[in-house]
Amino acid sequence: MKRIIAIGAIVLSVGFVAMGQFHYAFYYDLSAGQDLEINLINAMPWTNDVSMAVHDAYGEEIWSMTGELAGYEPGYVRLGENIASDSLHWGVVTVDSSDRLIIGLEYFKDGLLISIDTVYSETPVLNPNEQFWLGTYYTQVGDAETAYIVMNPWASIASCSVAVYDANGEPIYSEDFVLGPYEAEYVRLEDAVGSGGLVWGFLDVSMEDVSVIIAVEYSGRGCSGLEIDNVTEYYF
């Protein structure tokens, strides 16, 4: 049986947040029948302290918890058991820990498991004027659709630029974002670039000073409703 880390909102202590050495972030959605189970796995042989905070689309904290995992122990939280469904209950979840974690994510829609993802890379702290890039695949071919979510996992303002290139490497879309603390933005590429035989390829995100993360939702082309991938590995 899975061990439940916490079954209620616990106020985060300032002391614990200050001692957190590892910072992770990923996407959740509790709107339109969706849910998320978060599996936190201690990758170390000693005790690992963890804290989690869930933010709505505007960056407001709506739920938080703290817990402790013994060496190599897993624990899980089902967000829908602690947070009500709401049109604004989507965006970024942040996890701070005293040592390394592996985070398994099980996404549900209408009670059915639709996607599994794993997050193991920390969200980096950038130096002033330091640039970073995230990149991923998108497709708008046939009945395929891609949406991306850009999220700020920090308590400070973050900015980034998103560029989309077609199959010939030509730029077909770009947008700049300024995100408040823990704020998220959702963009359907159908609205931004339409669809077509050459509308697939590279989605690039550049940032400076403060790091962001993205998630991508794929539908169509045989997907079982929805495929959700978090993009947290920075390529440069």
Go through each PLM region and give its residues.
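Sec-dependent N-terminal signal peptides
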Residues: 4-15
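Gly/Pro-rich, tryptophan- and cysteine-flecked surface segments typical
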Residues: 19-236
